[in-house]
Amino acid sequence: MRKPLMAGNWKMNKTVSEAVSFVKALKGAVTGVSNVEILVCPAFTVLYEVNNEIKGSNINLGAQNLFGEAKGAFTGEISTAMIRDTGCSYVIVGHSERRQYFGETDEAVNKKTKAALAADITPIVCVGETLKERENNVTFSVIEKQVRNGLADLTLQQASLTVIAYEPVWAIGTGKTATPDQAQEVHSFIRKIYAQMYEESAEKVRILYGGSVNPGNVSDLMKKSDIDGGLVGGASLEAESFTKLVKYSK
């Protein structure tokens, strides 16, 4: 049985004081929740303070990115050791905004994924198609390429520990959402490709949906057999709305 994961991706939002206020409110609201794994992924600048605030709670900490090298002359980058030192157990890899604005390739995603796993940090590896790709009916070929290249050459154990997030790029921050059936179709396809690559690990891997998840659609999405949680953007920035996602009912 795959435990649902609700992951809040704060993107470039929240100062230290705003972040601390948020997690204080969230911590109180989700006390006692054990059937859903809760994750917040703040900006690098507030990881330390957020970690101090959530210690001993049921909230996990993740980073939004990492670099594939252990250390060195890579100005502006951050390593797995630095992330772990702030208390992170997860890291987002290959988010569509990283691919779009910073030119991240599947090969870079693969390197980061392996670096995270080597450091015992769980990568949340993002895949997804643009609106143009969906309209051109190449969604599945795009997704297959991203999965096969971005998640190549893992051990079976690493493959089962990895989390995948399907984020249709056309549904991120637009208010548009893939219907539950559309999302399930792609999630099922991802699991099928993963099974070809890593056999039984495909049944263990959690596949999150990330595309304008909100309190109004989360229950219908989570009813689908291959949707194991959400990678949440805007709705994770307010404690009240994120709590509703965490406490969704099928």
Swiss-Prot record:
Tell me a GO biological process for this protein: glycolytic process
Does this UniProt record's set of keywords contain Protein biosynthesis? no
Give the family from UniProt.
Belongs to the triosephosphate isomerase family.
Broad enzyme group = isomerase
What domain of life is recorded for the organism? Answer: Bacteria
| CDD domains reported for this sequence | TIM (cd00311)
| Alphabetically ordered keywords of this record | Cytoplasm, Gluconeogenesis, Glycolysis, Isomerase
Its annotated pathway reads: Carbohydrate biosynthesis; gluconeogenesis; Carbohydrate degradation; glycolysis; D-glyceraldehyde 3-phosphate from glycerone phosphate: step 1/1
Record's protein name: Triosephosphate isomerase
Write down the EC number.
Answer: 5.3.1.1
Organism of provenance: Endomicrobium trichonymphae
Q: Which reaction does it catalyse?
A: D-glyceraldehyde 3-phosphate = dihydroxyacetone phosphate
Gene encoding the protein: tpiA
